């Protein structure tokens, strides 16, 4: 997972019931609604404004990544956005640089 630090987020994809963060190869998939903090404002997907806020991370790099008590995966981007991915019940984390990391 720490392999994502320093990587550029090349795309954010909204797919039916999940959101994907693409890193020119690796993909971070959130099956539980992500949150993004832009300054003091917090947007919860799929509420109004959340898609625009999530798109702000496209073209930025991951500066830090934290897994807190196995309940949330959070990363901060080079433009100061903080993305928080809740880990759903039974969520599994698997990561290889050439595969998909699925959260929730």
Task: List PLM regions with ranges.
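Surface-exposed, interaction-prone regions used to assemble/regulate multi-protein complexes
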Residues: 1-104
């Amino acid at each position: 997972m720490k392999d994502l630090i320093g990587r550029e987020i090349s795309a954010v994809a909204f797919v039916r019931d999940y959101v994907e963060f693409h890193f020119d190869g690796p993909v971070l998939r959130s099956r539980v609604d992500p949150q993004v903090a832009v300054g003091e404002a917090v947007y919860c997907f799929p509420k109004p404004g959340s898609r625009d806020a999530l798109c702000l991370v496209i073209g930025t790099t991951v500066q830090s990544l934290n897994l807190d008590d196995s309940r949330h995966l959070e990363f901060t981007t080079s433009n100061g956005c903080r993305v928080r991915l809740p880990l759903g019940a039974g969520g599994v984390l698997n990561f290889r640089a050439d595969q998909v990391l699925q959260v929730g």
